[in-house]
Amino acid sequence: MKKFYILIFCFFAFAANSMEKKTTFDKDLFSKAQSEGKIIVISSWIEYCGSCANQMKVLQKAKKEGELLDIKFDNIEYFSFDVTNRDIANSFDVLYQTTLLIFKGETEVYRSIGETTEDLIYEALKASI
């Protein structure tokens, strides 16, 4: 049984570290995107979080594919930040990692915590158009 727990721990540790996690949030770029009325996706993460890595994979897949349900993903600005950066987290009232926010211009149109299901994330992005 102990080996099983070690194996599970190693699996989640690998999953959490398999994605490059870095803060890409920039207040000036965010403000510019808002003033231009763009769709803005913001995700929060923390270093050891496996579900954060899964959510980032879904968002990166959508971006890499270039199209998301008949829209170009490059029409959407994407930012991420480490939830331990309390200045950014507090500015969006984010308390937990794996929080996903979608803005249409200055209006927040979607918020979820822990969502990693590709179909639901894609649906939220499509609904924000």
What are these regions (language model features)?
Residues F92-L101:
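Structural micro-motif
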Residues I102-I129:
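Non-catalytic, surface beta->alpha helical segment in thiol-disulfide oxidoreductase systems
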Residues S44, D70-R86:
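Thiol-based oxidoreductase modules, predominantly thioredoxin-like and allied folds used
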Residues S35-E47:
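Short active-site neighborhood of thiol/selenol oxidoreductases, capturing the structured segment around
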Residues N17-G37, K126-I129:
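N-terminal leader/targeting and pre-domain segments
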Residues F9-N17:
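Hydrophobic h-region of N-terminal signal peptides that target proteins for export
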Residues A53-L68:
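Typically the conserved alpha-helix immediately C-terminal to a functionally engaged Cys/Sec
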Residues M1-F4:
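Positively charged n-region of N-terminal signal peptides that target proteins for export
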